[in-house]
């Protein structure tokens, strides 16, 4: 086997840009910066917002009803 072909695997600190949380892991990179981590991600914190699409569906159905009504009048 070839000697010294693998990169250095060292301890690095991962920094979250959103909440400032930092934790240590191992990697071949020198620094790791993440946009969102498990401390500030909505799924993990329980602050997940549900998107209400009922208004959008109703608006689409209303538009679609108008277009089908105008097509029926044209025939």
Swiss-Prot record:
Q: Which GO terms describe its cellular component?
A: ribonucleoprotein complex; ribosome
Q: Name one Pfam family in it.
A: Ribosomal_L31
Task: Work out whether the entry's keyword set contains Ribonucleoprotein.
Answer: yes
What name has this protein been given in UniProt?
Answer: Large ribosomal subunit protein bL31
Supply the PROSITE patterns for this chain. Answer: RIBOSOMAL_L31 (PS01143)
Q: What does this protein do?
A: Binds the 23S rRNA.
- Sequence similarity: Belongs to the bacterial ribosomal protein bL31 family. Type A subfamily.
Annotated TM spans:
none
- Residue ranges the record marks as coiled coil: none
Its domain of life reads Bacteria
Subunit structure as annotated in this protein's UniProt entry? Part of the 50S ribosomal subunit.
Give the matching HAMAP family: Ribosomal_bL31_1 (MF_00501)
Q: Which PANTHER family match?
A: 50S RIBOSOMAL PROTEIN L31, CHLOROPLASTIC, LARGE RIBOSOMAL SUBUNIT PROTEIN BL31C
Q: Which GO terms describe its biological process?
A: translation
Keyword annotations for this protein?
Answer: Ribonucleoprotein, Ribosomal protein, RNA-binding, rRNA-binding
Q: Gene encoding this polypeptide? A: rpmE
Q: Name one GO molecular function term.
A: structural constituent of ribosome
């Amino acid at each position: 086997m070839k000697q010294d072909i693998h990169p250095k695997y060292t301890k690095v600190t991962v920094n979250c840009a959103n909440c400032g949380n930092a934790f240590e892991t191992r990697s071949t990179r020198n620094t790791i910066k993440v946009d969102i981590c498990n401390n500030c991600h909505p799924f993990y914190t329980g602050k997940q917002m549900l998107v209400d699409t009922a208004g959008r569906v109703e608006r689409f159905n209303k538009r679609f009803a108008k277009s089908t009504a105008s097509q029926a009048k044209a025939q």
